[in-house]
């Protein structure tokens, strides 16, 4: 009987099992990107500056203190980590747009599933971006370079050129420090209103740009201990009037045919009290909107992004991708909780760590990690009927997480 049973068991030759396509996610924080990569059916590896516990639970992570390669020696931590994955494609996460030296190095010797370095540098030069948009008759916020300051009357913002997450932004008035008058900063006319993001996907070849969707951004929320201009969350999908969306779609097209962007990219913009949108920044890589729109709308955007550079890899990976679970409500939000003071984290790691749906808490530090005041602690997620409902639930979730945070005395000078 045992022999007969073995005859009818299905035969699986493990030597013929094809591996999932591998990809290296590189950026300041890669957890959301890695989870999107998993949902798309790829096998991810990561290099980032946080190496959070939930990221480590699902992939191999190479932690680095900085993405800078100002010291271009083989002992540079970033270059050493990248060298271990020299044979697999690289996917850019947040912060990479501010590392021109690293982008140049990678483009010379690695396969990149992302926009070209030249295109990234164009849209990250504020004056060049504003002049380019004005040349095609788009309304833009006035921009001035750091060595040509406007009046200190509070109607301008001074921003780092290599900015991320709203860090380093201040109002340009009499209290602003003089060290902002350099080539590393620029001035942008101030406009008040809610902040939104739009997400696009563009093939490298000529053709239309796909408008993916809109999200509402949370900025400077005291409930999350965020600084005045600090990015601290996202809710989506968002809906805006048709005439506003039409203009946003046009911006997405211009960023491809005039500046050369491809793959996933996003823009941040403010809608003023008159209902007019004003572009404030371009993010030439996958953004926080990717995760929210994937989970809230049942999409697999990472595979669509990869298809812009390698259609066969994208098709192969989709064979491994599980169907997305149904949304739990109309909107999904993510909030970033910041440390109000120096603290130690005891946030428990969920078991198991989930990547195919929104976790209650993510970006979880290793137990006992000390986090300095003003630094991000973790992310919380919530579903709801609209932006206000989701935001209230996110703030409540943040209060629950704070129960696992312990104040720590400042380190001696």
Predicted regions and their residues:
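A conserved helix-loop-beta module that forms one wall/lid of the active-site cleft
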Residues: 109-176
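A short beta-strand motif that forms the metal-chelation/ATP-contact edge
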Residues: 23, 159, 200, 276-285
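ATP-dependent carboxylate/phosphate-activation module, predominantly the ATP-grasp catalytic core
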Residues: 192-195, 199-260, 271, 283-307, ...
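ATP-grasp fold ATP-binding core
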Residues: 133, 153-171, 183-199, 212-216, ...
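A short glycine-rich, hydrophobically flanked beta-strand micro-motif that places a catalytic Asp/Glu
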Residues: 261-273, 320-323, 413
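Short acidic-glycine loop/turn motifs at beta-strand connectors
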Residues: 173, 202-209, 272-275, 340, ...
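Peripheral (often C-terminal) accessory segments that flank ATP-dependent C-N-forming ligase machineries
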Residues: 1-11, 306-413
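ATP-binding N-terminal substructure of ATP-dependent carboxylate-amine bond-forming enzymes
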Residues: 1-128, 135, 366, 372, ...
């Amino acid at each position: 009987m045992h022999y007969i049973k073995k005859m009818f068991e299905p035969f699986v030759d493990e030597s013929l099992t094809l591996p999932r396509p591998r990809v290296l996610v590189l950026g300041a924080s890669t957890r959301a990107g890695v989870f999107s990569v998993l949902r798309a059916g790829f096998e991810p590896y990561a290099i980032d500056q946080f190496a959070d516990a939930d990221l480590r639970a699902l992939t191999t992570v190479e932690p680095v203190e900085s993405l800078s390669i100002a010291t271009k020696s083989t002992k540079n931590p970033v270059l050493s980590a990248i060298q271990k994955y020299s044979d697999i494609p690289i996917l850019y996460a947040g912060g990479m747009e501010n590392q021109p030296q690293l982008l140049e190095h990678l483009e010379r010797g690695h396969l990149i599933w992302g926009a070209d370095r030249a295109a990234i540098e164009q849209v990250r030069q504020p004056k060049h971006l504003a002049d380019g948009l004005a040349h095609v008759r788009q309304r833009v916020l006035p921009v001035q370079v750091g060595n040509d300051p406007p009046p200190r009357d509070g109607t301008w913002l001074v921003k780092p050129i290599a900015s991320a997450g709203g860090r380093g932004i201040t109002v340009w008035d009499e209290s602003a420090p003089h060290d902002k008058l350099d080539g590393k900063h620029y001035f942008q006319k101030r406009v008040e209103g809610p902040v939104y993001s739009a997400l696009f996907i563009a093939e490298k070849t000529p053709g239309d740009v796909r408008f993916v969707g809109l999200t509402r951004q949370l900025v400077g929320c005291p409930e999350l201990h965020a600084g005045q201009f600090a990015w601290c969350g996202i809710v989506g999908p968002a809906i805006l009037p048709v005439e506003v969306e039409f203009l946003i779609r046009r911006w997405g097209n211009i960023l491809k045919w005039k500046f050369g962007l491809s793959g996933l990219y996003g823009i941040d913009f403010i809608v003023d009290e008159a209902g007019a949108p004003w572009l404030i920044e371009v993010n030439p890589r996958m953004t926080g909107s990717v995760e929210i729109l994937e989970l809230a709308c049942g999409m697999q955007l990472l595979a669509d992004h990869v298809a812009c550079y390698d259609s066969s890899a994208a098709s192969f990976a989709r064979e491994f991708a599980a169907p997305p679970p149904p949304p739990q409500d109309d909107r999904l939000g993510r909030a970033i909780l910041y440390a109000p003071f120096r603290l130690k984290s005891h946030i428990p790691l969920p078991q198991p760590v989930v990547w195919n749906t929104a976790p209650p808490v993510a970006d979880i530090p290793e137990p006992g990690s000390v986090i300095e005041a003003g630094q991000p602690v973790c992310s919380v997620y919530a579903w709801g009927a609209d932006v206000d409902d989701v935001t209230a639930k996110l703030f409540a979730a943040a209060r629950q997480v704070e129960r696992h945070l312990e104040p720590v005395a400042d380190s001696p000078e």
